[in-house]
């Protein structure tokens, strides 16, 4: 499955590849056109890999929160988990918990490397999901390459745990806040999968 909103990128790459291939054939394979056609094929393949959006079976539960993004945990502080998405990761983001989207705020900013602390001033999109345990903030942060944040959801939408809520093109970072009713279960350096990896579990003294 290809990620929603990626069609124009794939069409552009495939069209350029086809154009160079036709020109190369029509001109008896001029070296630079032949090279351009091969580069276009490689770019199209990269786009297909990058914009993939595999179906994942999500085990929905109020007993835990799941990762909103594929990637590596690069920081955990003040009950916030920061996940860096590399280029090879799936870049579709998912709701870590079921609830209602209370607020979506887009903020302009810079494009520093997303793994730097100064990236807090980067372009971002902040979701506030109101859950039965309080508000959960999911923040999509742009980086040096990722300069296009895509939103699939709207304010007042009800979302299920694991539902697709957006995407960041070409790698970046997603932060998620953890309510005090939960214990964080991941560590810095751990690899996580959106919709699959449990990142926090409900405390034993709470009912669900």
From Swiss-Prot:
Its EC number is 4.1.1.-. It catalyses: archaetidylserine + H(+) = archaetidylethanolamine + CO2. It comes from Methanosarcina acetivorans (strain ATCC 35395 / DSM 2834 / JCM 12185 / C2A). Belongs to the phosphatidylserine decarboxylase family. PSD-A subfamily. Keywords: Cell membrane, Decarboxylase, Lipid biosynthesis, Lipid metabolism, Lyase, Membrane, Phospholipid biosynthesis, Phospholipid metabolism, Pyruvate, Zymogen. It is found in: Cell membrane. InterPro entries: PS_Dcarbxylase (IPR003817), PSD-A (IPR033175). Heterodimer of a large membrane-associated beta subunit and a small pyruvoyl-containing alpha subunit. It is an enzyme of class 4 (lyase). The keyword Lyase applies. This is Putative archaetidylserine decarboxylase proenzyme. Its cofactor is pyruvate. The modification Pyruvic acid (Ser) is found at residue 172. NCBIfam families: PRK05305.2-5. Is synthesized initially as an inactive proenzyme. Formation of the active enzyme involves a self-maturation process in which the active site pyruvoyl group is generated from an internal serine residue via an autocatalytic post-translational modification. Two non-identical subunits are generated from the proenzyme in this reaction, and the pyruvate is formed at the N-terminus of the alpha chain, which is derived from the carboxyl end of the proenzyme. Binds 1 pyruvoyl group covalently per subunit. Catalyzes the formation of archaetidylethanolamine (PtdEtn) from archaetidylserine (PtdSer). The active site is at residue 172. GO terms for biological process: phospholipid biosynthetic process.
